């Protein structure tokens, strides 16, 4: 945010609504009238005035991503399956080994779409006007849960074809939904850290009151596909907010085991539990470019799964049968741009 040279207004970057591109705006002073300076599909950051002029300098960021599929036993044999501009940028999951659900914004809204890997165009299953993200397939592929911004983040459920959409949570805000491949329930993180019993919650896909799973305040979770174990990240407020990562059994049959050293919270939130293994697949750039690596929960050394030399990985999913890997993969390009105030 910066004052104009005449002191009659402010320049700032902001979104008109959640999920929209970040644009440059002018707010006049003192009446507070708002005027849009840019109006396109790019994102702008760090708006400022060029030296000795009224021209605006900003950083324009262009993000592109599409869905790619590879066999789990040969993850470098990867093939592109969608052509959208930002496919999977805000989440993706397998409905079946032959069908992917993912975030998309070809319509200008952040929708959820589904595509069959055997061919055919993608179909929107949750569309405007809300901003949808973090799709997770539940109940043996019959249901999709996701976060929808409806005056706050709340979790919704729809049938896999986009019918029978219903809101499942109604608190201050709810994020990071996870669910087992089989079973009609989900776990999520409540944004209300003061909620009784802890903010790691469990709810039925049929609706009703959610309940606490563990008495911790958590900031990220990851659920095994069999629904028996859950990883959670929490901050130890008695120890300089040190992050701890614990593994808990959903039925309480074993005490919480804390991992030492813990994986980073990004690995925990964005990684995926490998079917049949005590390990996560996650994105790491230690090789020089973002690639998939394994993080063992039993102390085994990490293993590199892919060997890309360029590009970004924005998200990943593993099919329930363990046969396929899906990636949201693309690029981020940034350029400095100059705008005349007459624009």
Which sequence ranges carry the predicted segments?
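A short, acidic, flexible beta-alpha connecting loop/helix-capping segment that sits on the rim
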Residues: 322, 330-333, 342
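Extracellular glycan-interaction surfaces
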Residues: 192
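Conserved beta-propeller blade repeats
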Residues: 1-15, 20, 40-59, 83-103, ...
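Cysteine-rich, disulfide-stabilized extracellular repeat modules
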Residues: 6, 20, 30-33, 52, ...
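Multi-bladed beta-propeller domains
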Residues: 14-18, 26-45, 70-90, 115-133, ...
